[in-house]
């Protein structure tokens, strides 16, 4: 029986590996979950369509989830621009208990200023980054490591050290992306289900 609901944007390059990703999440978390995805083009995950996508999540996707899993914690996550979108989503709505922002594109112009004024509403915040991602001379990508470090310090101040995590992985932005996503989602599953099990009647109802 699932103990948690995962929500993520699904870009075309992720589709063929989705089942593998889910298997890795199950292996890493050791707990049941259900995943809801919505298909997007990666370029839609910042600026122009994000408001429309958020409206779809809040008005349509969440309603479908609550019809079956209203008592389960909700986690939103993504990779690259999807990771940035997931983190941004939690600054606009409090519906998600946790966020897994894996190798998020925090180098986007204006992000730090935006987040300073609009902190995340999630209870648990996970970020990850490849150790080589900042080892480049290309702007703005070379800034991503320091931006992630500053972002993590904000998370510590907002939710506390036990409620946030910054994981450094081997490799660059394209190394083991499915495993990185799995570890992020698994951390969120573990945190949001730490005091619940499938027979616990005290879990929240939205």
List each model region and its residues.
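Intrinsic disorder/low-complexity segments
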Residues: 191-206
């Amino acid at each position: 029986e699932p103990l948690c609901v995962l929500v993520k944007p699904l870009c075309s390059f992720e589709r063929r590996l989705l089942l593998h990703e889910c298997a890795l999440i199950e292996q890493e978390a050791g707990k049941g979950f259900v995943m809801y995805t919505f298909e997007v083009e990666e370029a839609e995950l910042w600026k122009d369509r994000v408001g429309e996508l958020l409206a779809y999540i809040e008005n349509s996707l969440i309603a479908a989830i609550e019809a079956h899993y209203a008592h389960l914690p909700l986690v939103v996550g993504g990779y690259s621009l999807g990771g940035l979108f997931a983190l941004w989503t939690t600054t606009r709505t409090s519906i998600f208990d946790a966020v897994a922002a894996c190798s998020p594109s925090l180098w986007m112009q204006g992000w730090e200023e935006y987040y300073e004024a609009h902190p995340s509403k999630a209870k648990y915040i996970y970020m990850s980054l490849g150790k080589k991602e900042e080892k480049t001379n290309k702007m703005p990508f070379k800034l991503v490591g320091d931006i992630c470090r500053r972002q993590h310090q904000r998370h510590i101040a907002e939710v506390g050290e036990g409620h946030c995590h910054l994981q450094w992985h081997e490799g660059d932005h394209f190394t083991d992306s499915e495993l990185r996503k799995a570890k992020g989602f698994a951390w969120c599953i573990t945190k949001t289900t730490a005091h619940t099990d499938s027979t616990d009647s005290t879990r929240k109802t939205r």
